[in-house]
């Protein structure tokens, strides 16, 4: 017989306790799944999107980081250092801001924003003291670190790196908090990417190298100026016959071109970069699909760029590509011919094209579909290509510009202008009139006189 405690058996108490533990574990597991799969309305991310830091929230959306931050909040608390709006609007270098907003620099923008977020909760009361030095925290960015400290002699003013915390614990939520800071924190890797892109180091050509020179005395390559010369008074290297013989008639070799063995231009990487930019930018998936899957134009463009050519691509958006009929695409080689007409072997930006049409009125650009040219003119404050129903406006400027490839978005598919066949009219000569021979004047008078008296039958010619 089981022992009883206050009228209940020990076995009954044990099973009741076991079931309570299982129910608690199931409830906690269900709570974790819900927390990681769906963000609560009281989340710090929702607070950021609805806060005064509108510029930072807009950059987070443009960088496509909402899903990444939702996953981070589902795993742990986060601390966000949010720059004030004025720091992003007026204090930031316009060229640097333009660099961040270009679709091709999405990774740099993501690294910049993630370096403002620490994957743990750090409140203002957890700041190190003035005499304890700086405390290092790893951010969500790629190997980016933030140092927290207090400025000495300023009554405990808090610092993150070298930026002052202007609003400590500005927004606090159960899954994180937001501190307001005075300026943007720029990682060194992002600054190097900006400097490299601004100086065009990754795509600029190297200095040409001269052809090797041959010493006629030795029939060998000349050594550099720093090499040790033959001392004076030493015997000649070659016999006198070889020294007096005429040297080889060699023309100087050309300097190595862009498509040489050094591969100064990586055309394949640049074409792949601009196609990825089209996909991330949105609205040009059909154009990217034709370049990569339906044709081999991506490979051809990469080869051209590697050889030193520059290209400008007039990219029709998906809406324009959807208007193409089956007959226009079913002919052999039709997609290639259509795309060739949209590629200009020049480097043009929206500004350069607009300035040209404003200055010259109408401009014609060569295309890869030789000998057809695409015409451009100024219309409605923009650049209009083509004419009539087959025209298109430049409405999405400078989607991708890297100094070698320029992509400009247009709202229509261009076709070469069909020249009307001129009907050749054969020149007709003047109509020759047959002049009847006139009878003599005397004969006419005689016939008329004989006719008056009824004797005209006497002359057979009357």
Curated annotation (Swiss-Prot):
Keywords: Glycoprotein, Proteoglycan, Repeat, Secreted, Signal. It is found in: Secreted. GO terms for cellular component: extracellular region; plant-type vacuole; secretory vesicle. Residues 40-185, 271-414 form the FAS1 domain. Glycans are attached at residues 32, 77, 293. Transmembrane segments: none annotated. InterPro entries: FAS1_dom_sf, FAS1_domain, FLA15/16/17/18. Pfam families: Fasciclin (PF02469). Residues 1-25 form the signal peptide. May be a cell surface adhesion protein. Belongs to the fasciclin-like AGP family. This is Fasciclin-like arabinogalactan protein 18. The lineage of its organism: Eukaryota, Viridiplantae, Streptophyta, Embryophyta, Tracheophyta. The gene is FLA18.
């Amino acid at each position: 017989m089981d022992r009883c405690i206050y009228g209940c058996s020990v076995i009954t108490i044990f099973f009741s306790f076991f079931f309570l533990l299982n129910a608690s574990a199931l409830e906690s597991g269900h709570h974790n799944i819900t927390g990681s799969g769906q963000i609560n309305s009281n989340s710090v991310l929702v607070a950021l999107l609805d806060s005064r830091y509108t510029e930072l929230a807009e950059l987070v959306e443009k960088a496509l980081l909402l899903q990444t931050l939702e996953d981070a909040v589902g795993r742990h608390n986060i601390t966000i250092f949010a720059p004030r709006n004025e720091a992003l609007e007026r204090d930031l270098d316009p060229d640097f801001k333009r660099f961040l907003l270009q679709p091709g620099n999405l990774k740099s923008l993501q690294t910049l924003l993630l370096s403002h977020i620490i994957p743990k909760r750090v409140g203002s009361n957890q700041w190190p003291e003035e005499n304890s030095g700086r405390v290092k925290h790893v951010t969500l960015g790629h190997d980016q670190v933030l140092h927290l400290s207090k400025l000495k002699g300023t009554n405990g003013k808090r610092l993150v790196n070298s930026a002052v915390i202007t609003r400590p614990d500005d927004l606090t939520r159960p899954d994180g908090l937001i501190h307001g800071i005075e300026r943007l924190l720029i990682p060194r890797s992002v600054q190097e990417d900006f400097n490299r892109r601004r100086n065009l180091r990754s795509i600029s050509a190297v200095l040409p190298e001269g052809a090797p020179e041959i010493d006629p005395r030795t029939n060998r390559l000349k050594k550099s100026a720093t090499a040790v010369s033959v001392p004076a008074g030493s015997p000649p290297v070659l016999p006198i016959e070889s020294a007096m013989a005429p040297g080889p008639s060699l023309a100087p070799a050309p300097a190595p071109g862009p498509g040489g063995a050094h591969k100064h231009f990586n055309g394949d990487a640049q074409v792949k970069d601009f196609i990825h930019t089209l996909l991330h930018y949105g609205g040009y998936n059909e154009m990217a699909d034709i370049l990569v899957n339906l044709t081999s134009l991506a490979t051809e463009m990469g080869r051209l760029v590697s050889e030193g050519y520059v290209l400008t691509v007039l990219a029709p958006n998906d809406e324009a590509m959807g208007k193409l009929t089956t007959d226009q695409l079913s002919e052999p080689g039709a997609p290639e011919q259509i795309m060739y007409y949209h590629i200009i072997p020049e480097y043009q930006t929206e500004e350069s094209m607009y300035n040209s049409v404003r200055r010259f009125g109408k401009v014609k650009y060569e295309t890869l579909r030789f000998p057809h040219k695409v015409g451009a003119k100024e219309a409605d404050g923009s650049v209009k290509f083509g004419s009539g129903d087959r025209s298109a406006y430049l409405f999405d400027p400078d989607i991708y510009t890297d100094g070698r490839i320029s992509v400009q978005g247009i709202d229509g598919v261009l076709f070469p202008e069909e020249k009307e066949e001129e009907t050749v009219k054969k020149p007709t000569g003047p109509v020759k009139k047959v002049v009847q021979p006139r009878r003599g004047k005397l004969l006419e008078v005689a016939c008329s006189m004989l006719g008056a008296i009824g004797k005209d039958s006497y002359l057979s010619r009357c």
